[in-house]
Structures are given as structure tokens and as C-alpha cells.
UniProtKB/Swiss-Prot annotation:
One of its GO terms (cellular component) is cytosol. GO terms for biological process: tRNA methylation; tRNA wobble uridine modification. This is Methylenetetrahydrofolate--tRNA-(uracil-5-)-methyltransferase TrmFO. It is found in: Cytoplasm. It comes from Rhodopseudomonas palustris (strain HaA2). FAD binds at residues 20-25. Catalyzes the folate-dependent formation of 5-methyl-uridine at position 54 (M-5-U54) in all tRNAs.
Amino acid sequence: MIIAAPPPQPASNQPVHVIGGGLAGSEATWQLARAGVRVVLHEMRPHRSTEAHKTDGLAELVCSNSFRSDDAANNAVGLLHAEMRRLGSLVMRAADANQVPAGGALAVDRDGFSAAVTKALAEHPLIEIRREEIAGLPPEDWGNVIVATGPLTSAALAEAVRALTDESALAFFDAIAPIVHRDSIDMSIAWFQSRYDKAGPGGSGADYLNCPMNREQYDAFVDALIAGDKVDFKDWEKDTPYFDGCLPIEVMAERGRETLRHGPMKPVGLTNPHNPTVKAYAIVQLRQDNKLGTLFNMVGFQTKLNYAAQQRVFRTIPGLENAEFARLGGLHRNTFLNSPKLLDAGLRLRAAPRLRFAGQMTGCEGYVESAGIGLVAGLSAAADALGRSMTTPPPTTALGALLGHITGGHIETIDAGPRSFQPMNINFGLFPPLAQAPTHGPDGKKLRGPEKSVAKKQALSARALADLDAWIAASLKLPAAA
């Protein structure tokens, strides 16, 4: 079911202001205008550019030109594509119209894509585009505002948001550790236990997964970390210093062979129930990353190793030999909110509800994810402007699962360590489990191995699209196109 444009309605007298003409801001603007709401879109380029942007086009793709897999049945980002298409996404329309050959992926001509988005927004009668920088919090008389300024948010606006919230509200380095699917961890080697069996708020005393190493395994691991191929910083990232709490694990290893086992891999306060008489030389800990307990992050393992090196090196860890990664690690300059603390379910800032946030600044990672959250923010702001109520997308959908991660799906840290919320790509680990996972194929044969995993993903996708259609009919009340 593809959603047709809603019937024409009187435009709201008070426009909604959108700050930032990237993927999220452009999509939010489009959704507002489609609903009959006047929009003023503020984009600071070309008057003020960033280190990464090269043009003044809206929705410029500053890195890759890929929107990743377009397989809605078997891939979470492909499912997100499908959901956004059903909701009349401008970003997906422009991507489809400017597609370039890329196998099963959706890749685009970046200039054609940006030009298509810019043209659609510039020609819409309810959209005004102002080329100006908003160097602080928007004026009160603007009313409802969507802030979608992205990972390169200007310093003035970032400081204004920080002052309105608190000192820990913004991070300027993405400290991304790898995330592993729980069911791919070998529990004949790993075990659950918190250090010294400490039970923190909401914890049980067995909140971490532990993977032990002996001396030989540890030394080989350190050597592999140091020798692994690294990803270089982009030119515009090189002047941003490391924060002590965000050092890449390979940088810690380079500072001394014992650094890691006195840091994130320290073996103290833990006893291996599989081999209780043998003390591990070092221990890798994984911490639950989502409320569903389907994803675990590798504590302290933020890294600049390239993806191939990460998979090779991290699968040498006992218990992770067959690890499936929902996300690999990284460290790059970014600006994002501690969204579960600061935003409500409608993406409104709790300290100032007239302000909504959208896109990468909220803690989603990736082009499509940013545009998807912009879409939800635009729909929500349109409902407010038109005096309607709108529920959030169901958590069983890709949009709802991503929104759930941003506004409440993370786990607070158990100890006194740094907060656990970090940016995330869409993946099936964010979705609630199926009430009944498929066990047999269409031919009646019992599913095993990869076939079982494929059937599970397909069932999650089918459920998501059915639930999205029901939500559209009940919450948005928009007519469906034939």
C-alpha cells in the first residue's frame, strides 16, 4: 500500500520552521508540506559551508552514494526503504529516480539525487527556502521548530542546545563499539556475570557477558590489533582530538602491552563457571545494548580498524568465533544528543517541547535512517500543526524500532561508566522478537542454520509491513493509492 498525498487542506497560518537542509530536514519539510502545512526551511549553505560539504544543494550526500540494500524481505535497511516509500518519502522517490547500478544495493547519482530533492522542495507552493545560518536557538515567536542540523552542526547552535540541556547532552566524537547478535555468542565459553557480582540500577549482578583469554591468546590479540589495517580520519576530522574515554582500542594497545588488561579487558572480580579453578589473563566484556536483550556491545572496543580487520581480529576472541555483528565499530567526529534522556517519544526536547530534533543528531546512523527519522518528525509536527493526534509507528516496524532506540531503547550504564547511548543503524536486533519464529519451510521441512535465519528475517519484515499498513490506516487516516 503506497500512501497518496492527503486531500488539500487549508495551510496552517503559523509555519513550521525546519533548520537544516540535509536528508532529515528535507524529508521533514516534504512531509509537512504534503500534509498542507506551510514550512520555512533554513539552510546555511552557501553562505556558510562545512568541512565536508562541496555544494549548496539540499540533501547533499557527503560520503558514500549508497543507501545500502534494497531487499525489503531480508534486510532491515531494505525494509526501511519500503516503509518510507509507503509513506510518500521524497528522499526515496529521488533515490529511485536517480538510481545507478549497484547489485542488490540502492546507489544513486549523488548530484542528480540532490538536484531532484532541491527542485521538489523549491517548487512546492507551501515551502519557503531561506539561505541563512541560525546561529543559536530559534526565536520563541517561530513556534514549532524541527532542528535537523546533522553531525556537523555549527558550534553556535550546538552550544545553545548544550546550555538549554546539560553538559553531557552532546558528544563531539562518535565512540562506536561493535555490537554483536546475542544468539551468535558461544555460551559454552562465555558467561553472564557483573564484576564482583555488583547489581547496579536495574541490574541483576549478572549483566555482562564475559569472554576469557589466556596469556597466549591475549598476546596474539594485542599483536593483531596493532597490526590491523586502520581507516584514516577524513581531512575535516583530523583536528578533533581524542577524548580519554573514547580512545580507539588499538591506540590503547599501542601504549603498552598490558594497557588493555588494566583497562577494558581487566580480569578482576570475575570467575569463569566453565573452568572455575583457572583465572583468565584478560576478559572481554559485552553489555546488553537494547531492552530486548538481542544485542550486546563490546565494552570499550571503539576502533578505527577497517571492517575486514575488525571481523577477523574480534572473531579470535574466545566465544566470538562465530559472532554476527549488527554493527561494526568506529570513531569519527559527530554531534548527537543523549536522546533517550532529552527527547520524548515525539522527538520533542523535554526542556523546550516546541523544538523537535531529527536526523543524525538524534542518534541514528546512516543516510536512510536520518531521512526516516526526519519523516517521522515531519509527520508528528504536521499532526501538531493541524490539531490532530498521531501515535508513533509500531515498534515492530523499522521506523518504530529505530525511533524506539533513539527515544528509549538503550540501556543505562550499570556502573559509574559513561552513558551507553550511541548512534545506531537499523538492524533486526532492534525489533521485538516474533511471537512464533518460523520452524518449518513451505515444503514442511524443518529449518536449520542459514535457512532458519532467512525465514526469521522474512517473517519480521512481513510483520513490519502489515503493522505499518494498519498504523497508516488507523493513525494517519490517509487514502491509499491504487
